From Swiss-Prot:
Segments of this protein annotated with the region Disordered: 98-167, 255-278, 351-379
Motif, CR1: chain positions: 383-387
Protein name (record): Zinc finger protein 704
Transmembrane domains' residue ranges: none
Protein source organism: Homo sapiens (Human)
GO molecular function ontology, one term from the record: zinc ion binding
Gene name, Swiss-Prot/TrEMBL: ZNF704
Length: 412
């Protein structure tokens, strides 16, 4: 009994051991499998983390690169050279322009008496030494530059009260050898506006002024001056005046000095019937003597019309006191009109004999017109395209009427 019991116990123990070994082996296999799976999962997780980190790095790079301001493409060397060339050209043009190179002119340079008597006004500069001579004419007429003089030639004309601006005379003499740059002359043509109303011919400098003149004087509209239906545009035209010729004409005429004309009043004998023009010729030769540049006194009234008031010369009384012993004369300038009207009164009178009498010589000195003015004949206001065809048929008007000028189709 005991043996059987022990054998059964051994069998049970062996069976238990075998089962335990089998279970252990199974457990070991399962542990190995789980360990392998864990390793594989860890490797996969590691790879996933690596890929995620790489993606995050790429995203960060993209964000950073999008925020960085990329500088523009640099210019090529040729473009830089072209920019330098253009800048140099601009600088050279500015440095050689007459507006920059021309030195300032002293307006109050002292003049000697000889230049005043001669009528030429020297205009000097403080640094360059260029001199230019201009006749006494309008201030708007620029003087023509003359070749430079030496440094010693303009020393007497410098003002002692105004020293030079720190420039030595050696430097000034060096500047004299440079070629003077000719200054640009202003445009001498000036546009004026002439009234085309019959027997009017008034010339003004602005279109608004001539329109107001036509509206108020000729059309008789006294109401609102700003309101206009455009009718006055048909009664004026544009003309061009040469201001240089006007200034030359003004400079050629000078007022006669009362001291010369009153010093020796002309006495005339009794004229014969056959020699009536002799005193006039004498008076004319007397008036053409060298004239002084001194300012006219109260014995003279000098009336100078401007270019835009080019009307026929009108004799204006020179003084309210008229004495029969004076000789009146009038110098009239047709175009440009400059009218000098004066009555010189002689302070001393020669004794007049019974057989002598004084004459009032009226001499008119006229010179040919110098300004080339294209003046058209004033048209009448009877027939015009606007009045013939009407405002509604503008296509039938002539070109002048379409452009609001004087009618060219219906002439007087």
């Amino acid at each position: 009994m005991t043996f059987t019991f022990q054998s059964e116990d051994l069998k049970r123990d062996c069976g238990k051991k075998m089962s335990h070994q089998h279970v252990f082996s199974l457990a070991m296999e399962e542990d190995v499998k789980t360990a392998d799976t864990k390793k594989a999962s860890r490797i996969l997780d590691h790879e996933k983390e690596n890929t995620r980190s790489i993606c995050l790095l790429e995203q960060k790079r993209k964000v950073v690169s999008s925020n960085i301001d990329v500088p523009p493409a640099r210019k090529s060397s040729e473009e830089l050279d072209m920019d330098k060339v253009t800048a140099a050209m601009v600088l050279t043009s500015l440095s050689t322009s007459p507006l920059v190179r021309s030195p300032p002119v002293r307006p109050n340079e002292s003049l000697s008496g000889s230049w005043k008597e001669g009528g030429c006004v020297p205009s000097s500069t403080s640094s360059s030494g260029y001199w230019s001579w201009s006749a006494p004419s309008d201030q708007s007429n620029p003087s023509t530059p003359s070749p430079p003089l030496s440094a010693d030639s303009f020393k007497p004309f410098r003002s002692p009260a105004q020293p030079d601006d720190g420039i030595d005379e050696a430097e000034a003499s060096n500047l004299l050898f440079d070629e003077p740059i000719p200054r640009k002359r202003k445009n001498s043509m000036k546009v004026m506006f002439k009234c085309l109303w019959k027997n009017c011919g008034k010339v003004l400098s602005t279109a608004a002024g001539i329109q107001k003149h036509i509206r108020t004087i000729h059309l008789g509209r006294v109401g609102d001056s700003d309101y206009s239906d455009g009718e006055e545009d048909f009664y004026y035209t544009e003309i061009k005046l040469n201001t240089d010729s006007v200034a030359d004409g003004l400079s050629s005429l000078a007022p006669v000095s009362p001291s010369q004309s009153l010093a020796s009043p002309p006495t005339f004998p009794i004229p014969d019937s056959s020699r009536t023009e002799t005193p006039c010729a004498k008076t004319e030769t007397k008036l053409m003597t060298p004239l002084s540049r001194s300012a006219p006194t109260t014995l003279y009234l000098v009336h100078t019309d401007h270019a835009y008031q080019a009307t026929p010369p009108v004799t204006i009384p020179g003084s309210a006191k008229f004495t029969p012993n004076g000789s009146s004369f009038s110098i009239s300038w047709q175009s440009p009109p400059v009218t000098f009207t004066g009555i010189p009164v002689s302070p001393t009178h020669h004794p007049v004999g019974t057989g002598e009498q004084r004459q009032h010589a009226h001499t008119v000195l006229s010179s040919p017109p110098r300004g080339t003015v294209s003046l058209r004949k004033p048209r009448g206001e009877g027939k015009k395209c606007r009045k013939v065809y009407g405002m509604e048929n503008r296509d039938m008007w002539c070109t002048a009427c379409r452009w609001k000028k004087a009618c060219q189709r219906f002439l007087d």
